[in-house]
Amino acid sequence: MKLLVTILVLASGLMASDEKSAKDASHYEMTTYVLGILRKGPNWGSGTKEESTRIQEGHMANIRKMAEAGKLIVAGPMGDDGDLRGIFIFEAKSPEEVRAMTEEDPAIKSGRLVLEMHPWYAAAGLRVNDPKTAK
């Protein structure tokens, strides 16, 4: 009988803990980010292979620069060859702040990519750690 009582007490404690966790998870602190959507631009696919390589290297350097500044928190390409080429998520006050950071990106500057921006509401503290630098 003691064993049955012990099991019931433990089970009720676990259920209460699960209910508390579920309630806590629904109370995230929210904040506004800027979602950037990269699409093929009017000059997509133009130029020589050398130009494309130089532009892509500059594009990646700009991504690193924005990430190191703590402004670009998520970036990545799409997995197919459609018009949608990639996404950025910025921790920035406005699309104008993002525009100032991205207007020097060679892929955007050359018209190979076009950046569309939208305010985006999500959980505060959104981060993706670089596996090379995560400790």
Label the predicted regions:
Residues L3-S12:
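Sec-dependent N-terminal signal peptides
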Residues M1-L3, M60:
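Hydrophobic alpha-helical segments, especially transmembrane helices
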Residues S17-K135:
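Conserved, structured core segments of small domains
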